[in-house]
Amino acid sequence: MTLTALNAISPIDGRYVNKTRALSPYFSEFALTYYRLMVEIKWFESLAANDTIPEVPALDNKARKFLSDLISNFNESEAEKIKEFEKQTNHDVKAVEYYLQDKFQENEQLKSCVAFIHFACTSEDINNLAYALMIKQAIAQVIQPTIAEIMGSITLLGKQHADVAMLSRTHGQPATPTTMGKELVNFVARLKRPQQQLAEVLIPAKFNGAVGNYNAHVAAYPEVDWRKHCANFVTSLGLSFNAYTTQIEPHDGIAEVSQIMVRINNILLDYTQDIWSYISLGYFKQKTIAEEVGSSTMPHKVNPIDFENAEGNLGLSNALFIHFANKLTQSRMQRDLSDSTVLRNLGVAFSYSLIAYHSVAKGNDKLQINKSALQKDLSENWEVLAEAIQTVMRRYNEPNAYEQLKELTRGQMIDAENLKKFIKTLSIPEEAKAELMKLTPETYTGLATQLVKAFS
């Protein structure tokens, strides 16, 4: 059976394949094979460039081009050849080595250097670099731009609605008014920090042999400064070198990435739930598409499905990222293999995040402010001005300011007339009374509008 979106087991490669395809070059089986191949070749090239390893001479132009072409021209057909070797070896990294041994026979200089493919390496030397590069590239090329797009769309909504007054709700109850714009940019302000951390996080990598001590390296070439050579090799690939490891790099860097992703996703979970609530309150309407159906039985329905989809997928993603952070940092003694199958699911976690991010962006594009609903809620909750009145009373030493307003408003439905009657009884300057008399729930928004306009 040919794998299609219809018969794929995972919705990542099925229903949502159009949303996740951008991650395929970084997290597919082909991608892992490609990055392993690249690391093996780059390691071989580093040996050839080291004058203290005479058995691997400096590469001539033909050999350099041949190796470069192996990387740049690598395709699914070549990957299938590696899979054929794996059927014999039952070992995926060894299959890459055998494939390269076979390829080296096609170049006059390289065929005499076959023994130096995978030289002094354990599989984890290759794998940890491959995964680090995959994560780094996926974040830079796909995840970060998508997060930036979401932040941009939320910021735009916030700026558009900077001065649209809104009744706040704390504990689900009416509270001091804010503006819709201010509530939206709050989320962007929160996202900035983890987004920056994600951009700056260094993913450590090791290249120090079977148990991290360069045993085989030193046995073969005791005169070579292997610590320097391997550190230079790892950093040349844009990664951070971890000099102290067991057989495996302990994955603390991947755990850090996972925890940052969870924080980003939790902020977006909070956002999707708030937008869902605002839609439920009628504060936002959603643009309708004529051909779409909201319910199989209720023709009137326009549901917040994009935000609900995002919420579900963010939860799935977080479950995996939390597991990565907890599981990958633990390995028995010098290593056990339980991390291997977990690492193969890195792309699954990023994919669920990406699906959610696309849903958030799509949902944002449908939002239309419903000012009449916002104004109605404000006009029905004049009691929220109690805070302003009692605070002004305190300024002028009006006795029992808080208690007076509590008695007047707590659990009561208060209208403008009730408040104005109360204000007239106060022993505060007439100018202060006049200012309070002008105050309405819609104008009592503090510096919310200015905060949005100043936000960048």
From Swiss-Prot:
Coiled coil region boundaries: none
Keyword Cell division: no
Swiss-Prot/TrEMBL keywords: Lyase, Purine biosynthesis
CDD domains: PurB (cd01598)
Active site, UniProt feature: 171, 295
Keyword Lyase found: yes
Pathway recorded for this protein: Purine metabolism; AMP biosynthesis via de novo pathway; AMP from IMP: step 2/2; Purine metabolism; IMP biosynthesis via de novo pathway; 5-amino-1-(5-phospho-D-ribosyl)imidazole-4-carboxamide from 5-amino-1-(5-phospho-D-ribosyl)imidazole-4-carboxylate: step 2/2
GO biological process: 'de novo' AMP biosynthetic process; 'de novo' IMP biosynthetic process
Leader sequence segment: none
Catalytic activity of the protein: N(6)-(1,2-dicarboxyethyl)-AMP = fumarate + AMP; (2S)-2-[5-amino-1-(5-phospho-beta-D-ribosyl)imidazole-4-carboxamido]succinate = 5-amino-1-(5-phospho-beta-D-ribosyl)imidazole-4-carboxamide + fumarate
Domain of life: Bacteria
SUPFAM superfamilies membership: L-aspartase-like
Family per similarity comment: Belongs to the lyase 1 family. Adenylosuccinate lyase subfamily.
Subunit structure: Homotetramer. Residues from neighboring subunits contribute catalytic and substrate-binding residues to each active site.
Function, in words: Catalyzes two reactions in de novo purine nucleotide biosynthesis. Catalyzes the breakdown of 5-aminoimidazole- (N-succinylocarboxamide) ribotide (SAICAR or 2-[5-amino-1-(5-phospho-beta-D-ribosyl)imidazole-4-carboxamido]succinate) to 5-aminoimidazole-4-carboxamide ribotide (AICAR or 5-amino-1-(5-phospho-beta-D-ribosyl)imidazole-4-carboxamide) and fumarate, and of adenylosuccinate (ADS or N(6)-(1,2-dicarboxyethyl)-AMP) to adenosine monophosphate (AMP) and fumarate.
Name assigned to this protein: Adenylosuccinate lyase
Species this chain originates from: Legionella pneumophila subsp. pneumophila (strain Philadelphia 1 / ATCC 33152 / DSM 7513)
Gene: purB
